[in-house]
């Protein structure tokens, strides 16, 4: 155990920015530039990670087209003259004008006092609305997520190359993406490129086709840029071999299957989820303190991005509903990167003006359009009211986002990696794996036999919800409900003695690794608890 850490004295700043995404980083950058060197004592940026992720290129990391360091930029180098604090926001106390943050394992919670508060915390990922998705779906929101997806795909290829059972191989070579927005479509396109390019290096996969399946709940992909371009993106992806399922909602996910529209299912061991955005709990708590009604999970603001009745509270980005004059029509700004970075810059300028006794200006932005890649040398675009697709759209996507990528060194690295990709195959080396969860959760659908008699025992289970039955011919069934442990009582010589089947939709915790070795040594967590 580490030595006890004494409580830290509170920190104090004139301006405290919460969130290190586009809005928060560009706000800090603007303030640091306008206030100069003195800003380091007056302005602080609190972020969970010390680097800003350039999300438009994140899918290319998952597809092994770019290295992870190409899409992150250190906040301390980006936000000059600003104090960057790596910590997680625990609580915002608006009445006390303070924020409680968690700095890490060896520090106590830190209190930070402020005069002006800028909330740019964005949204969170919540997959719990689909049974099993939290346990078996991989989100796509961070560099860690992208690397995890890349590792999973390459691991599936390696396992499929070794498998002799054709049905097992088919499940291993089926990659399912849920959600047909920007993240889902761009990630699906990158995975398709990676898998198609990699198969030639796996000698045993020539006769088993890989499947990349995209499931979307709406009638068109990329509804943000209109049905015409969404339909074009669909045609391009289908022409390249992707399966696209529209007007379909996912109902359940397990380690070997995904179910949609209640009765349809796909055998797969790889599920990538681009759905599940949910309001940030800290933002919702702040709204409750202020007595204001969130707008679809976002803080409503004035055009200046101040919260009505609270001139020292500002909000921007995905967690803020910012009014926007779209050529004479008032709308709420969409939660996209191009709006977030401009909102952040405007807040920085507004706060600098208010500190000088001047008035804050409203947020204005002339919408330029949107672009999305759908694979190698293919993209769709809506720019200045014009819609087009193909190579020109792809070239424009790369040119525009390369220009927006922070840091000259990163621009040069991305140019090199893109050039390298045109000439050589994508990298199939497995990145260093993250430390696994010692007790991960797993979900089983009703009727699923997830262990068969004679299988090697690689883990024990504790049932969290549902009902699991252990069966063997000529023997009485055993039933395991919530709180029950399925352990060595069901094994013999390292093999399972019975089939394990989920009678109803069930969740369980897995014990493996050192915990499994301890249990195999004879330690029982609780009596079998079978009934």
List the predicted regions and their residue ranges.
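A Rossmann-like FAD-binding core segment of flavoenzymes
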Residues: 82-101, 105, 192-303, 307-309, ...
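C-terminal, flexible cofactor-proximal segment of oxidoreductases
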Residues: 1-3, 10, 339, 346-433, ...
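Cyclic nucleotide-binding regulatory domains
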Residues: 443, 448-505, 513-519
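FAD-binding core/adjacent interface of flavoenzyme oxidoreductases
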Residues: 2-12, 83-176, 272
């Amino acid at each position: 155990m580490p030595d006890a850490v004494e409580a830290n004295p509170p920190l104090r700043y004139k301006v405290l920015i919460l969130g290190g995404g586009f809005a928060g980083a560009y706000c800090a950058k603007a303030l640091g530039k306008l206030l100069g060197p003195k800003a380091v004592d007056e302005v602080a940026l609190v972020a969970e990670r010390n680097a800003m992720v350039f999300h438009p290129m994140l899918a290319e990391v998952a597809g092994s087209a770019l290295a992870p360091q190409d899409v992150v930029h250190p906040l301390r180098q980006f936000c000059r003259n600003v104090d960057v604090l790596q910590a997680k926001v625990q609580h915002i106390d608006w009445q006390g004008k303070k924020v409680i943050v968690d700095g890490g394992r060896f520090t106590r919670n830190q209190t930070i006092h402020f005069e002006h508060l800028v909330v740019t915390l964005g949204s969170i990922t919540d997959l719990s609305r689909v049974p099993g998705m939290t346990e078996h779906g991989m989100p796509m929101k961070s560099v860690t997520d992208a690397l995890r997806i890349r590792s999973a795909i390459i691991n599936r290829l390696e396992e499929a190359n070794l498998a002799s059972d054709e049905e097992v191989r088919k499940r291993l070579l089926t990659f399912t993406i849920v959600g047909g927005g920007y993240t889902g479509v761009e990630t699906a396109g990158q995975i398709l490129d990676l898998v198609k390019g990699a198969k030639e290096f796996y000698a045993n996969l020539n006769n088993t086709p890989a499947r990349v399946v995209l499931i979307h709940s709406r009638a068109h992909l990329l509804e943000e840029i209109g049905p015409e371009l969404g339909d074009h993106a669909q045609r391009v992806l289908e022409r390249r071999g992707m399966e696209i399922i529209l007007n379909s909602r996912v109902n359940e996910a397990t380690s070997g299957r995904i179910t949609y529209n209640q009765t349809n299912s796909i055998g797969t061991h790889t599920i990538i989820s681009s759905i599940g955005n949910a309001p940030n709990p800290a933002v919702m708590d702040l709204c409750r303190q202020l007595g204001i009604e969130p707008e679809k999970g976002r803080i409503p603001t004035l055009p200046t991005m101040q919260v009505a009745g609270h001139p020292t509270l500002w909000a921007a980005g995905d967690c803020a509903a910012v009014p926007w004059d779209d050529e004479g029509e008032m709308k709420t700004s969409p939660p996209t990167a191009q709006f977030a970075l401009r909102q952040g810059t405007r807040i920085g300028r507004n706060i600098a003006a208010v500190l000088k006794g001047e008035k804050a200006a409203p947020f204005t932005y002339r919408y330029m359009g949107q672009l999305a890649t759908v694979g190698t040398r293919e993209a769709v675009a809506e720019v200045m009211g014009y819609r087009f697709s193909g190579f020109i759209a792809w070239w424009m996507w790369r040119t525009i986002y390369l220009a927006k990528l922070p840091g000259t060194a990163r621009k040069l690295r991305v140019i090199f990696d893109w050039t390298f990709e045109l000439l050589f195959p994508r990298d199939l080396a497995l990145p260093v794996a993250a430390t696994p969860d010692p007790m991960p959760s797993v979900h089983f659908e009703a009727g699923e036999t997830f262990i068969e008699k004679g299988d090697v025992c690689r883990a024990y289970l504790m049932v969290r919800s549902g009902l699991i039955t252990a069966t063997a011919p000529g023997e009485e069934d055993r039933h395991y409900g919530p709180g029950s442990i399925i352990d060595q009582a069901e094994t013999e010589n390292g093999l399972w003695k019975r089939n394990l089947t989920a009678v109803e939709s069930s969740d369980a915790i897995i014990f493996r690794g050192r915990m499994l070795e301890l249990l195999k040594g004879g330690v029982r967590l609780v009596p079998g608890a079978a009934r």
